[in-house]
């Protein structure tokens, strides 16, 4: 695989062109910074009527980062996430094209109107546990996410990530060839995205694995919290 350096803007712009992204990284490796960068890019490219952001963030690391007029929901517990994701799944199911939708409508996505929906999940390992996974209701929608205006971006710690391969959301993303990012992590976790292992690295140093570009190295710029 070819390895090249890429900047922050290209990484985020490309992600918003794709519906699915997952990221693994240790503590202080740049996971929440990446999500803040995604939020900045969403608000740069879309107006508040064109994009709504739904945050699942049990540690509240992104609290105050999403402008109020873009915020669809901020979910900080299992119970809140269960209700919020169930409602969101029902909403996006209503956008699934029926048999009367023409090929031209499919190409232009003109059979529905409304905002793009961005689901940002920080510390996914706190969300998908042995007690259940309230985000799993989105799994059946991921194959059609681009057609439905649904985007799912999640981060997870590297520890135990090899077990996450069997998680319904991550497994579906993997099956669909979603782009994955590895920040700093322990290589003893094994192959996490394709055949790529995590490596110890400075914050923001990323290995980006995509179906069409293979393995690309990038340094994600630090996006500071807005309250600092």
Locations of regions flagged by a protein language model:
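Single conserved hydrophobic/aromatic residue that forms the stacking wall/gate
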Residues: 1-12
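Phosphate-binding P-loop
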Residues: 13-18
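Hydrophobic anchor at the beta1->P-loop junction of P-loop NTPases
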Residues: 23
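The conserved Walker
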Residues: 27
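Conserved glycine(s) of the Walker
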Residues: 30
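Mechanochemical coupling/switch segment within NTP-driven translocation systems
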Residues: 33-35, 41-135, 158, 185-188
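Alpha-helical scaffold elements adjacent to nucleotide-binding pockets in ATP/GTP-utilizing enzyme cores
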Residues: 37-38, 84-87, 137-141, 169-176
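Conserved ATP-driven motor cores of ASCE-family P-loop NTPases powering translocation/secretion/packaging/pilus
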Residues: 92, 142-144, 148, 153-227
């Amino acid at each position: 695989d070819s390895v090249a350096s890429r900047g922050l803007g290209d990484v985020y712009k490309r992600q918003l062109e794709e519906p699915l992204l997952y990221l693994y990284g240790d503590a202080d490796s740049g996971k929440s910074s990446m999500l803040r960068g995604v939020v900045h890019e969403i608000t740069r490219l879309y107006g508040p009527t064109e994009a709504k952001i739904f945050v699942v963030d049990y540690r509240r690391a992104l609290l105050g980062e999403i402008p109020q007029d873009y915020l669809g929901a901020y979910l900080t517990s299992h119970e809140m996430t269960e209700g919020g994701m169930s409602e969101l799944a029902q909403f996006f199911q209503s956008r699934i094209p029926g048999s009367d939708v023409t090929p031209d409508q499919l190409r232009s996505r003109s059979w529905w109107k409304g905002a793009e929906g961005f689901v940002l999940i920080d510390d996914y390992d706190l969300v998908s546990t042995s007690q259940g996974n309230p985000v799993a209701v989105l799994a059946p929608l991921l194959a059609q996410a681009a057609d439905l205006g649904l985007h799912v971006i999640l981060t997870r710690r590297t520890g135990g990530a090899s077990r996450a391969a069997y998680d319904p959301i991550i497994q579906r993303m993997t099956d669909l060839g979603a782009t994955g990012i590895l920040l700093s992590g322990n290589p003893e976790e094994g192959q996490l995205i394709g055949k790529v292992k995590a490596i110890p690295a400075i914050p923001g140093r990323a290995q980006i694995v995509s179906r069409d570009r293979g393995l690309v190295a990038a340094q994600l710029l630090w996006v500071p919290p807005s309250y600092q």
